[in-house]
Amino acid sequence: MHGNEIKWKRRSSRKARDIAARILGYLALGFMLAILVSIFAYIIKGGAAAVSWNILTTYGNTSDGGVLNGIIGTWELVGMGLLFSLIPGVFGAIYLTQSVSRKHVADAMRLFTDVLTSVPSIVIGLFGYLVLVIKFNLGYSLVAGGLALGIMMLPYIMRITEMSFRNIQREQVMNAYALGADNVNVTTRILLPQASAGILSGILLAISIAAGETAQLLYTASFNSAGLPSGLTHSPVGYLTYFVWNGINQPSAYAHNLAFISAMILIISVTVLILISKYEDVVGRLLRRILGPLGVILNRVFVEAPSEKEDKGTSKGEKKWKK
């Protein structure tokens, strides 16, 4: 009887702990949802009340005009940053995944990318100003701002792409090597197509973070209230976060309205990007269809073409270059 009573008390204690943990989980979830809904409601309410077609389709600054230069400039800067970070990020992840014999180099790269992830954006902005704007004489420009954003986007793309590669079943990769496939074939036929959804998630995360940055752009892109940049260098660029940062500090109601509208556009854009990344299986299937033919092209360029030249060379008796 005494033993049954002890078992009953233990079961009751475990049940009480489970209930308490569940309640705490629900409270945490409710708290986060309350904060998220409050932010969305406050921003969208303020932006929707002030938005108009004229504001969305005209250039301006925080005291006059609209936010079209900010909308276009934001995505120009993000696109430029993606241009500078996508290829190094993906190929860096390929190296981290395939570099079995150079583990110390791969570990050093992971350390550097982790450190780069934690660098404050204002430090990247200061570096961009001193090195890109002044030292390399790019001026306040699309290239300088895009490079600053690319530095920030690079570690996110690299590490998430690496994790996507490592989630692929190792047996598939080893079987491909056992059948005689080289690194190019494994990368283009297995890694890239199967990890395409994860790569997309990393890209969208980097884009979402870059679209909301302000500090490094103040140092590298300045602001253009006259319209779009006239060139890649020595021409400032407008962006939405400037409207938010500068407009909310102005005394006029018009500047506050532009700040709310810009914040609303940003939060809606980021939400759409996140939703796309959540439905990565659908987008991933589309990317696999695109990357499949790309793998065939790369295979023909890097693998089949050299082998054909080798066959032709050996048929003529030109074998000395092999030695």
Each language-model region and where it sits:
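Membrane-embedded alpha-helices of multi-pass transport/permease systems
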Residues: V37, A41, I87-I94, L126, ...
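Interhelical loop and adjacent transmembrane-helix boundary motif
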Residues: S63, L217-I268
